[in-house]
């Protein structure tokens, strides 16, 4: 896939889906442009995870059209899609006792035949990503013994060795302390590929992501440049909270403080 800001990774038109008798997404129309870091935000139940599950083929029965690299998403095989798109889910069981190296190497599977062995090129790619994610010293450790932050980096590393054009992540900072949240966000946005990350934290969204998509009750409330969207009116309308927003000269980003409506 050509990675330029002038082309769309995803072209979404009139996307809707009903699950368990409830309409979750309602008429989503949106282009996700290559070369940008997008953050998908919205309250619980607004449809964030559902939208990501559609973009990653985990949900296939939907209305409307989704084009990926100009081709109907439904026409991709799982393997073909995984050769250019990687997904970091909200929950990863990690129940098998792989070493970190073995676990990350699983990300090379979309580029192999069923019985192909790991190649020198596979080893080079995995070793490079282990270095990049600060996991090289842990490559012989069991994945089951890692801390939350280490395991999240391993999950990201497994996605990165796919060498994707597009990386999709569902709340990757959940259960991480502040230090590991910042490290992980820096890793995500430094990849120089298209990323779409669902988050709850608007401060992280404003600090790391240039593009914002806001969902409210299954519809797009706003999308565009993050700095143009995050404001007290949006926060009050979408989250039912009052807020104060200040520009932080040290970070070059805004800081958001929240207040309950009834407390003001």
What residue spans do the PLM features occupy?
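Helix-to-loop junction immediately C-terminal to a conserved catalytic motif
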Residues: 56
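The feature captures the beta-strand-to-loop junction immediately N-terminal to the Walker
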Residues: 41-43
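Conserved ABC ATPase signature
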Residues: 116-117, 142-146, 150
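Conserved ABC transporter NBD signature motif
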Residues: 64-72, 81
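Conserved structural motif at the start of ABC-family nucleotide-binding domains
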Residues: 10-12, 25-27
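Catalytic Walker B motif of ABC-type/P-loop ATPase nucleotide-binding domains
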Residues: 167-171
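ABC ATPase nucleotide-binding domains
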Residues: 238-264
